[in-house]
From Swiss-Prot:
Gene3D superfamilies: Jelly Rolls (2.60.120.10). It comes from Alcaligenes faecalis. It catalyses: S,S-dimethyl-beta-propiothetin = acrylate + dimethyl sulfide + H(+). GO terms for molecular function: dimethylpropiothetin dethiomethylase activity. This is Dimethylsulfoniopropionate lyase DddY. Its main location: periplasm. Pfam families: DMSP_lyase. InterPro entries: DimsulpropLyDddY, DMSP_lyase, RmlC-like_jellyroll. Residues 1-21 form the signal peptide. The gene is dddY. Catalyzes the cleavage of dimethylsulfoniopropionate (DMSP) into dimethyl sulfide (DMS) and acrylate. DMS is the principal form by which sulfur is transported from oceans to the atmosphere. It comes from the Bacteria.
Length: 401
C-alpha cells in the first residue's frame, strides 16, 4: 500500500514538474517592445483578462454536460441521416482538443513564461486590425492607448449597402455584444460585460467586407472576428516543449438578419454561443460532414465536388436553433460543411442584435488555414442571393493527416 502511495506521489510530482518545466517558443514576429511602466500596466490588464478568457474556455470544454462524464457534449452534426437527428460527441474525445487543452494548461500554469509571447498588437504589420467604434475604444484605457483605426470610419468610407450594414453593426457593437447570458456554462462572464478591456483591445477583422464571393451585402458588412491566441492573434506561441501549438482562440460577431453561406476549412473548429436569442429561431446553424448522403459527391483532382440541394425546404431539417443553454457548443471536423443563418423569426423585427460566440480552431499550424466559401450552382450572379435553400457547390480539398 505504501509503495502504491509513494508511486502515486512520485507520478504526481513528475507531472507537476513537467508542467512547471514547460518551454515556450514564440512566433518569430513576436518582438519585445520598449514601453513605459504606465504602458506596461495597460498591457498587464489586457493580459489578465486574456487569461480569464482562456481559462474559462478550457473549463467549459472540460466540464461534463449532456451524456458526457469527462467533458462537454458537442454537436458534431445537426442532422445525421442514419438517425434523422443531431449527432453529438464528448468533445475531449478528439485528439486535437486534448492537445489544445494540454497547451492551455501549460499557459495557465506558467503565465509569466507565456506572457513573453503576448503582443498587444499596437503596431502589427501583417494586416490592419480595428476597434469597432469610439464608444468601444473608450471602454478601456488599454484600447485608447493601442488606438487602432475604427471600423465605423472604415465602413463610412466604404459606403453602399456593405457600408450601411457595417455601420449598423459597429455603431451598435456594445449593445449587440451585451445581449449575452453566460450563467449556464461559465463561472465568469466572458462577454464584453465581464471582460471589457479584452473585447475593446483585441484587434477586430472585417473578414468578408471586401470579398465579393461572400454572399449578401448585409452579411459582408455584418460580420467580424477577433483572434486572441493563435498565429495572427495577441498570444502567438509557436511551440511548447517542442510541440506545435495549434490553438487559435477568439470571438465572432454576426449581425442579425443575415445569412453566412455554406463554407468549410481544414482546421477543426468550435463555437460556444453567448447570445441569448430574442426568439427561439433567431439564430440557426448547421454542420454536416462533407460526405453526408444528404449531399452528392464527385471526386476531383485534389478533393471532392460536393453538391448541396436545400430546395423545397429540405434545408430546414438540417438546421438547429442556437441558444446559450442546450445548443451552445458545436465542433466541426475537418472539411465539415457549416452555415449560420439569422433570417428567420424575429430577425425581421428586432434591433441591435446578432450572434456572438467564443470561437476557436485547434490545428492552426497544418494544412490550409483559410475558410473556403461554397458557391451558388447557378453561377457568380447568384452570390448575393445565397441562402440555405439554394443549390450550392463546395469544392472540398483533401487534407493531409
Amino acid at each position: 500500500m505504501q509503495k502504491r502511495m509513494l508511486g502515486g506521489m512520485v507520478a504526481g510530482a513528475l507531472a507537476c514538474f513537467q508542467v512547471q518545466a514547460a518551454q515556450f517558443q514564440c512566433q518569430d514576429d513576436v518582438k519585445p517592445a520598449a514601453i513605459s511602466a504606465e504602458e506596461q500596466k495597460l498591457v498587464d490588464q489586457f493580459w489578465a483578462e486574456s487569461l480569464v478568457y482562456l481559462e474559462q474556455y478550457l473549463k467549459a470544454l472540460e466540464t461534463p454536460t449532456g451524456q458526457c462524464k469527462d467533458s462537454a457534449q458537442a454537436t458534431i452534426q445537426t442532422y445525421h441521416s442514419e438517425t434523422g437527428k443531431a449527432q453529438t460527441r464528448c468533445i475531449m474525445k478528439y485528439r486535437d482538443m486534448e492537445l489544445l487543452a494540454k497547451h492551455l494548461k501549460a499557459v495557465l500554469a506558467e503565465p509569466d513564461k507565456a506572457k513573453a509571447c503576448f503582443d498587444p498588437q499596437k503596431n502589427y504589420k501583417e494586416f490592419t486590425l480595428y476597434t469597432p467604434s469610439s464608444q468601444v475604444q473608450q471602454l478601456s484605457a488599454t484600447s485608447t492607448w493601442i488606438n487602432r483605426p475604427l471600423l465605423t470610419d472604415y465602413y463610412t468610407k466604404m459606403g453602399g449597402a456593405i457600408g450601411a450594414a457595417g455601420l449598423e453593426l459597429n455603431e451598435n457593437f456594445l449593445a449587440i455584444t451585451s445581449r449575452t447570458d453566460t450563467t449556464a456554462h461559465w463561472t465568469r462572464d466572458v462577454s464584453i460585460k465581464g471582460l471589457p478591456t479584452l473585447w475593446s483591445s483585441v484587434g477586430w477583422v472585417p473578414l468578408y467586407a471586401e470579398n465579393p464571393a461572400a454572399g449578401s451585402d448585409r452579411f459582408r458588412g455584418g460580420y467580424l472576428y477577433a483572434e486572441l491566441m493563435g498565429p495572427w492573434g495577441n498570444l502567438r506561441i509557436k511551440e511548447i516543449n517542442g510541440e506545435k501549438v495549434g490553438a487559435e482562440i477568439g470571438m465572432t460577431v454576426q449581425l442579425f438578419n443575415t445569412s453566412y453561406p455554406f463554407h468549410y476549412h481544414h482546421p477543426q473548429e468550435t463555437y460556444m454561443t453567448l447570445t441569448k436569442p430574442q426568439c427561439v429561431d433567431q439564430n440557426k446553424y448547421m454542420v454536416m460532414h462533407w460526405d453526408s448522403d444528404q449531399f452528392t459527391q464527385t471526386r476531383s483532382d485534389k478533393g471532392w465536388t460536393v453538391e448541396i440541394d436545400g430546395s423545397k425546404e429540405r434545408w430546414k431539417k438540417w438546421f438547429a436553433n442556437q441558444d446559450v443553454n442546450k445548443e451552445w457548443l458545436t465542433y466541426f471536423e475537418r472539411n465539415a460543411i457549416h452555415a449560420f443563418h439569422a433570417l428567420e423569426g424575429c430577425n425581421q423585427t428586432i434591433q441591435n442584435s446578432g450572434l456572438v460566440a467564443v470561437w476557436a480552431r485547434s490545428t492552426s499550424q497544418d494544412n490550409e488555414q483559410f475558410t473556403q466559401l461554397c458557391r451558388p450552382a447557378s453561377g457568380p450572379d447568384g452570390v448575393k442571393r445565397m441562402r440555405p435553400g439554394q443549390k450550392t457547390v463546395c469544392d472540398v480539398r483533401d487534407w493531409k493527416p
